Design a protein with these regions (language model features):
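Active-site-adjacent structural elements in enzyme catalytic cores
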Residues: 1-153
């Protein structure tokens, strides 16, 4: 994929045809713009170089962790699931609910770990996101596709 490639993901056929290509691009360190159920987002795989490029692209002067898009709780071992978090996930996932859970293992990159060792996760129901997550087999980071202080994209 070139530096600026647009891949159609509107239909089920598009997603089936292109999800593996997007997953390879992410594994190779690429950044992607993607739809979610709320706004457009920017994301990457959990690797040092693309995470640093994503932070620069967002012009983040101070460390602010990126959230993780997941298919479900099974995608993120190493988080402390409280009873309340489990109830919320069962009730509202997939959907626009972000849970902030304490990391119990140090296997998360610093770019996704917040104050107190927490990680924000969301199970997006958007078919494009799900197709990529299924193909990639791991979470991706996500942040809104706008600069700080600007309206969401």
């Amino acid at each position: 994929m070139s530096a600026h490639t647009s891949i159609p993901f509107r239909t089920a056929e598009d997603r089936e045809r292109h999800a593996s290509r997007v997953a390879v691009y992410l594994r190779d360190g690429g950044l992607v713009a993607h739809p979610t159920e709320t706004v457009y987002g920017l994301g990457c795989a959990l690797r040092a170089d693309p995470l640093a490029r994503l932070a620069r692209l967002k012009r983040r002067g101070t460390p602010r962790p990126f959230l993780l898009l997941v298919r479900g709780a099974q995608d993120v071992p190493g988080l402390e699931w409280t009873e309340a978090a489990e109830r919320l996930a069962r009730a509202f996932w997939p959907g626009p609910l972000t849970l902030v859970l304490r990391a119990t293992q140090g296997n998360f990159p610093p770019e996704v770990v917040g104050e107190g060792g927490t990680v924000a996760i969301r199970a997006s129901p958007h078919p494009a996101v799900l197709a990529v997550l299924d193909e990639l087999g791991e979470p991706i980071t996500s942040t809104s596709a706008n600069l700080p202080g600007e309206p969401p994209a």
